[in-house]
């Protein structure tokens, strides 16, 4: 399980897919991979937008390249990178304390923009 350390959440996700197989994710198509790589290259060359950004990643991330995320966020003047200790890829499907911190940080970002 590369998604979450929360066993109950993972069991719930598995039950959802068993009950509704159409919700399951398959592998990407070659067309999707090609388009994604093209977009990633374009975004890597572009400067960070002049906007606030919150990026929350799990410390144990094994799906996306955490080093690339760290590098991008280091170049984002209004960006904030939070690494959640012990978390996997899906921080909003993690244990309650991780999920709550992530949602609180997002709400604080939105509140700051509304002020």
Protein language model regions, located:
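Alpha/beta-hydrolase
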Residues: 1-52
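Glycine-/small-residue-rich active-site loops that bind phosphorylated ligands and cofactors
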Residues: 24, 61, 98
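Alpha-helical elements of Rossmann-like donor-binding domains used by nucleotide-donor carbohydrate transfer enzymes
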Residues: 31, 35, 71, 101, ...
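Nucleotide-sugar-dependent glycosyltransferase donor-binding/catalytic pocket residues
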Residues: 62-65, 92
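Short alpha-helix in the alpha/beta-hydrolase fold that links the catalytic acid
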Residues: 51, 65-74
């Amino acid at each position: 399980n590369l998604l979450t350390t929360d066993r109950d959440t993972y069991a719930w996700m598995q039950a959802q897919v068993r009950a509704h197989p159409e919700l399951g994710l398959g592998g990407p198509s070659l067309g999707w991979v090609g388009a994604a790589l093209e977009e990633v290259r374009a975004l890597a060359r572009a400067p960070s937008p002049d906007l606030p950004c919150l990026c929350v990643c799990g410390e144990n991330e094994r799906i996306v390249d955490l080093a690339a995320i760290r590098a991008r966020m280091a170049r984002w003047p209004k960006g904030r990178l939070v690494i959640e200790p012990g978390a996997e890829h899906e921080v909003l499907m993690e244990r309650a304390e991780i999920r709550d911190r992530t949602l609180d940080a997002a709400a604080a970002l939105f509140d700051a923009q509304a002020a």
